[in-house]
Amino acid sequence: MVFAWFVWLAFTQWTPPGTLLRKANLWCIIGIPGIWWIDLQVDGVRRGSLGKSPGSHMPEPGSIVAASHTSPIDILYLATILDPIFTQSYPGTKLVKPLTLLSALASCFSLPTPPKDRSGLLPLSKLVSQHPGRIIATFPEATPSNGRSILTLTPSLLSASPKTKIYPVSLRYTPADIVTPIPGLYSAISFFWTLLSTQTHCIRTRIGAHMRVPAADAAAMNPMPTHQRASSFESNYFDTLSDEEEAKKRVQKDEDGITETERRVLDMFADTLARLGRVKRVSLGIREKAKFVEAWTKGTKGRRA
């Protein structure tokens, strides 16, 4: 495995994307630790008939992959089969930061914080237009979870163009002991020890049908009323007030700077990821995880003392 990584760092990473040499090198990196058997299913396609089904069911150049995130293996696996451009999402902003393979792997063992200098951040729509021949991979949760739930999504997917296809992808592992929900050096050591001490791991991959982010004006025109409109005779000043309050709620922004309508769009993606992974959604995001990690770290230091 060390030799395979040496070949990648010294030579293969500089070769053009999608070449046979890159794929072979990445398959060696992912296969040597025992990650061989991959269970792949695609929405709307019967098992074993993916190549025979018409239409595009797999991510293609110019599209975006929105994947669940639990382990560094997510990144290695996606790099092996899709060779995408990885991105880092952040709370409170729709912009993302392009990452190299090594930077994406390193991000699994730390909590992302938006950089003070935002010159390196850009929307997904611009990244797709700059690289029309590549697939863009994003982890909208922004940080690995424990594999038992989908965290609250960051707003990064909202920066995609309404014309761009977004493929939800769920990645799970059996046994589920190579997840890295807690950042830090100890988590990295524990991950590598578990990975190398187990003979084999299975990747369960579920790819959903492509979705799109609705245009802002189209989303705003779907108010989804919560009350029945009275007759024109019964309509009065209070009906007008109620409509105005609903309109204000739809444009009012939360702590992440997104509106209620945009939150519904993110909920749609989160529901799909939860369905594909057969897990639950939780109302915890990266901010809550940061508080938990801080408390957990203090508790661990206290027990050691």
Outline where the language-model segments fall.
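Cytosolic terminal low-complexity segments enriched in Ser/Thr and acidic residues
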Residues: 231-276, 283-286, 290
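Catalytic core of membrane glycerolipid acyltransferases/transacylases, capturing the structured
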Residues: 15-27, 36-39, 54-118
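Eukaryotic N-terminal targeting leaders
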Residues: 1, 44-58, 284-305
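Generic beta-sheet signal
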Residues: 61-67, 132-140, 164
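Beta-strand elements of modular eukaryotic interaction domains
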Residues: 27-29, 38-56, 126-128, 194-195
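A cross-family acyltransferase "interaction/gating" segment
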Residues: 134-135, 142-256
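A Trp-anchored, charged/polar loop motif used as the substrate-binding/catalytic surface
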Residues: 114-129
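N-terminal membrane-anchoring alpha-helices
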Residues: 1-39, 292-305
